[in-house]
Amino acid sequence: LLRAKFKLYLDMRFKLIGDVNFSVEMQLINDKKNYSLGPHSDHSRKVISALLYLPKDMSQQKIGTSIYIPKDPDFISSHKEYGHFKKDLFHKVITMPFVPNSAFCFVKTNNSFHGVEPLEIEDTDRWALLFDIFISEETQLREEEAKTKFK
């Protein structure tokens, strides 16, 4: 279902490498007060992230994942530097509502950035189920070779 939804983006990323091998990873996470995550674009092996939000009620709707765009339109995150960047380099576009029965999915690109604003609610339990799709290391090597060859 996710591959069909994001087919255009996947075709653009993998058009030069033929067979693509995927793996999945799931994590149940619980973020607490003062947790934050600076703008970042994830590891180069990541393809799609799906976050299934698991709050107990509507009281946490303002603590979802935020989407950012760089202030410098030419800024991209290379696979060599996929760490977290300073927030002052970005504009926050939206924070997804962290509400029951909701999910947020996105494709990893070199210019798509997300993060979590500092959690300031007392007794925060920010439960989410993360479902990530990755390419294999072999596929990543073929992808890097294709990028070098067809620059």
Label the model's feature ranges.
Residues 145-151:
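Membrane-proximal basic amphipathic "stem/tether" segments
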Residues 3-145:
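Catalytic core of non-heme Fe(II) oxygenases with the double-stranded beta-helix
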